[in-house]
UniProtKB/Swiss-Prot annotation:
It catalyses: N-succinyl-L-glutamate 5-semialdehyde + NAD(+) + H2O = N-succinyl-L-glutamate + NADH + 2 H(+). Catalyzes the NAD-dependent reduction of succinylglutamate semialdehyde into succinylglutamate. It is an enzyme of class 1 (oxidoreductase). The lineage of its organism: Bacteria, Pseudomonadati, Pseudomonadota, Gammaproteobacteria, Enterobacterales. This is N-succinylglutamate 5-semialdehyde dehydrogenase. Pathway: Amino-acid degradation; L-arginine degradation via AST pathway; L-glutamate and succinate from L-arginine: step 4/5. It comes from Escherichia coli (strain SE11). Belongs to the aldehyde dehydrogenase family. AstD subfamily. The gene is astD.
Amino acid sequence: MTLWINGDWITGQGASRVKRNPVSGEVLWQGNDADAAQVEQACRAARAAFPRWARLSLAERQVVVERFAGLLERNKGELTAIIARETGKPRWEAATEVTAMINKIAISIKAYHVRTGEQRSEMPDGAASLRHCPHGVLAVFGPYNFPGHLPNGHIVPALLAGNTIIFKPSELTPWSGEAVMRLWQQAGLPPGVLNLVQGGRETGQALSALEDLDGLLFTGSANTGYQLHRQLSGQPEKILALEMGGNNPLIIDEVADIDAAVHLTIQSAFVTAGQRCTCARRLLLKSGAQGDAFLARLVAVSQRLTPGNWDDEPQPFIGGLISEQAAQQVVTAWQQLEAMGGRTLLAPRLLQSETSLLTPGIIEMTGVAGVPDEEVFGPLLRVWRYDSFEEAILMANNTRFGLSCGLVSPEREKFDQLLLEARAGIVNWNKPLTGAASTAPFGGIGASGNHRPSAWYAADYCAWPMASLESDSLTLPATLNPGLDFSDEVVR
């Protein structure tokens, strides 16, 4: 029984599904997808639960959410192992994900008050008030790269605001999704407030097609995000928040400490085996001897990165990709770039057949025409050389995406110029592209999102504002507008 609908664990009536560890092949989870009727059932449960949940005070909802945070803390080791085994991440990285989930609770509570709390301004004849109201029933689509943390970033603020939810995890991480839902159950969520439907494309299409849905919150690929946007077109009454991918540039200008810059680049391009939406995909490197030395050192250090299983000791920097198919797609992308004229500096290698263990790849594309503006979701870094900083900014902006961008340089003036001209939602200076603060908004422009950033701003798309003019009594104004006559004289 792997679906959680209206407080009950039930068996899916759709296609059967098996999840294996992407490195060892061990069977981790087996179950069935939700069919269209069960998706409808989950929606009815969420709709029925909404009025009572929304009418609870914020303090009452907060008690449940904070109880969930305590359960995350007490079950940190077990959840870390589940996420690591299912995604292929090393144990250390899965542990940081669970920590981020825990920290998200307090941050979301604070964001609720700052972004969507109540405000009141006194006026001579009353008051002006601002309140925020929940949308109703929201669908949350989760990604596989952070199957706990990223859905959590939608679910927690949505629940705090008073919404009820239907959650569909990625079909590649059903076990992590189920494990987190069981903790929410232990936290005491009333039946129907949060519902879990497992499944792939068919389940997702049934969920996004629900008429009685008030909104959809999505983190995932640009292709799927565009499909959802088209599916919900003509329905402005539904809130749609899309956080998609990026073809993110990292500009390496002047470098004082080459090893520090190489470390930052590896953290930007290859952490999580390149499976973060903010990962550097394009390295823009200044021409010259210093750039040559940096590139040689980057290749030398990257060659030493050996991916391993989630529980290997000593712990590896990177694990496997989410699947052997995903790893093969990266290799295919590299082969296509090489065929276009790219110069391979470090070839990505699948270490074993029937696993997703893939070493990083680096390929120089300077002077190659027609390079696709696509996100390769894995450890493959493309390199371009530039002569002037103005050229670097033009190259950085030469993408339909706009998620993250970074600069390595000692010059504040160049960062200030980048801040003015960059088209990206995250612009970092001497920090990895993959670094983002939960106390700031997270999202991009262009093909990276639809101007509804998550993290600190998630509260914004989880509630709508209600403005009020209020007075506890009604009296006739001392001064009336022209043409109004309230005298006692009878008009004949």
